[in-house]
């Protein structure tokens, strides 16, 4: 007689999903891994209260349409998440369940039900914008007599010039900036996608004056942030 094949439990599958699937096989970005981690932290906290059992006792078959629907409602109603954020959390759960179905086929019936649940539709509103005068007022708002004011001025000017997300701005380093006749900055976007954006002369000059990137700057680590949170 052949030995009975034992399927991995939920805890083992979740660990393998992060260490093997996301990090090793898919080479997911740290930002993606962090987002998925936060999703499951919220989900496990909710499931523990809902199922009245600790995360170590949760089984894969517990993650059914009833539990997932209640969790998504909890995100919107109790945590006041937007539909876009709610859908992002749901996408993380579905990604895990798709992997779990391959590793634990006996739970496919339950998993199939969750996978059949649709994403919630929402209105995609037009992006608002500021007038030229409003932008000038915003750029001139920081107090240049202070360290934080100088930093904020560079931050706003860079955002205006590049159209970068705040998360992308925070990750910009000294090594990403090129200051010469054709000044530019490299932006690290979602999904490990990089793009190079030209810098206007005014923006390049402000970065030089800020003191983090200068033609004859003292030795500063190329990995240093351009706009650090603190001094």
Give the label of every model feature segment.
Residues 1-231:
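Conserved catalytic core of the tyrosine transesterase superfamily
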